[in-house]
Structure formats: C-alpha cells, structure tokens
Amino acid sequence: MERKSRDLTLVAVYASLYVVLVYLFAPISFYAFQFRVAGILRPGIARKRILAAGYAIGVAVGNIFSPFAGPFEFVFMPIMSLLAGSFGYLVARLFESDYFVAGAVIAAVISMSVSWMLSMLFNMPMLATLPYLFISEQMVCFIGAFIFKLIETRFRWW
C-alpha cells in the first residue's frame, strides 16, 4: 500500500508541476514555435514509468490555457504524451534509465505529434514546423535531463 501511495503522490506532484510551468510560461508554451518550459520534467520518466501518466495528466490540464483548446489539445496530445513517456521509459531502460535517452525519445515523439497536430489544425506543412519543434523540444529535454542528473547526485527522488 505504501508503494502505491508514494507513486500516486509522485504522479500528482509531477502533473501539478507540469501544469504550473505551462501556466507560468503560457506565452511561449503554445503556437507553432513553442518552447514549453514544462518539458524539463519529461526526462524524469526514465526512472519511474508511472510518471508517463502524470505527464499525460499535466498536458491535459495544462492545455486548458491553450488558445487552441479542443479535441487535439485535450485528447490527442495527452494520449501522445502518455505514449511518448512510456516509449521514452522503455528505451531509457536499455541505457540504465538514462535521463538524456528518455528525454531525446520523448522530445522526438512529441515534436512529431505537435507538428502533425498543427498541420491538421492550421494546414501548416510539417516540414516547416517539425525542424524548429524538434530542436526546441530536444533543448528543453536536454536541460531537464541535466537538472535531474544534478538532483540525483544528492537525492534519490524516485
């Protein structure tokens, strides 16, 4: 029972932090050339698979602040976030749960998902949006992985 309580608490805190960061940085968290600072939390999924659920919940709630709120923001992106987080976790396990690997995988899946969503919503060509999204998502996840590595030198947070 204690393990489930701890995991539930981690998911709630993770999702809440994600939402707060999306809200605080809302001006740069949306649109075609987004830089979602909340993404620094994604690499943490490398250590706890259950955090993929927290990430998906955080995306769903954080997207309430989106100027494009609708089915893509409340259904498609949370599902893609759950899949990206789960895939990132599985690949990172092959590399000793490395934060950088998890972040790179998650960022790749999310940048493709956001690019596709923008092409559906605004008829923006994926070739125009994908390169910038890929770079910005990788940057955010790299910073996050570095932060998690620093935290891990002092604390076992998971």
Regions found by a protein language model. Give the residues of each.
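Membrane-helix interface "capping/anchor" motifs
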Residues: 45-56, 92-101
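Interfacial segments of multi-pass membrane proteins
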Residues: 46-48, 61-66
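Membrane-embedded alpha-helical hairpins and interfacial helices in multi-pass inner-membrane proteins
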Residues: 27-34, 64-158
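Hydrophobic transmembrane alpha-helices
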Residues: 1-46, 50-53
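Juxtamembrane loop-helix boundary motifs flanking transmembrane segments in multi-pass membrane proteins
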Residues: 1-4, 56, 122-126
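Small-polar-interrupted transmembrane alpha-helices in polytopic inner-membrane proteins
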Residues: 18, 55-63
